[in-house]
Amino acid sequence: MYSGVGIYDMLRVERDPNGAFNVAEFGRCATPSSFARSSPTRPTTTSPTARPTPAMLLTTGEHDGRVNPAHSRKMTARLQAASAPGRPVLLRVSSRAGDGMGSSRSEVVAEQTDVWALLFEQLGMRAP
């Protein structure tokens, strides 16, 4: 499974540098209805231990001004704590790019190589 530059903690997103733009879509955590809707999705409170997780690669940009990299870091840590043997949960942090906008061709190729490498490894695919 691959998740690129995700927003995972909806209760904190409005406090992020670009968070004000997400309020219209996701609501404010001070509003009871928004809090009730967003609370079950928090990576710090959800429990993926109830079922096995697939191998995962999450990506983020170290200097992303649109999506706080802490979202991917927290989600990765939570999933790693619940991962099954042989099902790695990996975080790829790009030091020179944000969430894809302005990424160089070599950065895009490097990220896609990692995505496909994990997929091929998990499917047991080998070079001929």
Where are these regions (language model features)?
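Active-site-proximal cap/loop segments of hydrolase catalytic domains
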Residues: 1-128
